[in-house]
């Protein structure tokens, strides 16, 4: 029996006082266990390169789980213990993009994924 994993992304938009802060995620898909997946988050409305960015996820019927975070110059990256070694967080400050690469997908990776600042 083949199991399928579902990855969804949420659009997060926060209105700022002088500008609109937006985080727009993409890359969600249905994958099989063992596959890999790359999620992206396009940021605007703030100085991306100066900002710590994070990924979180919410499995169906469960609470929000912190996945990891990365500082502005990518020198410091932290991961939740349960995902360390299978997830890679990176960023491209020239394009204001945040990435989450997930390898060796497991059923417990099924969740809605969020990027945050």
Curated annotation (Swiss-Prot):
Region named Framework-1: 20-49
Amino-acid biosynthesis listed as a keyword: no
SMART domains attached to this UniProt entry: IGv
Protein name: Ig heavy chain V region G4
Family matches, as PANTHER family: IMMUNOGLOBULIN HEAVY CHAIN (PTHR23266)
Region (Complementarity-determining-2): 69-85
Ranges where the record places region Framework-2: 55-68
Matching SUPFAM superfamilies: Immunoglobulin
InterPro entries for the chain: Ig-like_dom, Ig-like_dom_sf, Ig-like_fold, Ig_V-set, IgHV
Signal peptide feature range: 1-19
Pfam families per record: V-set
Cystines in this chain: 41-115
Keyword line: Adaptive immunity, Disulfide bond, Immunity, Immunoglobulin, Signal
Superkingdom of source: Eukaryota
GO biological process terms held by the UniProt record: adaptive immune response
Gene3D superfamilies membership: Immunoglobulins (2.60.40.10)
Region Framework-3: start-end pairs: 86-117
Region (Complementarity-determining-1): 50-54
Gene Ontology terms: cellular component: extracellular region; immunoglobulin complex
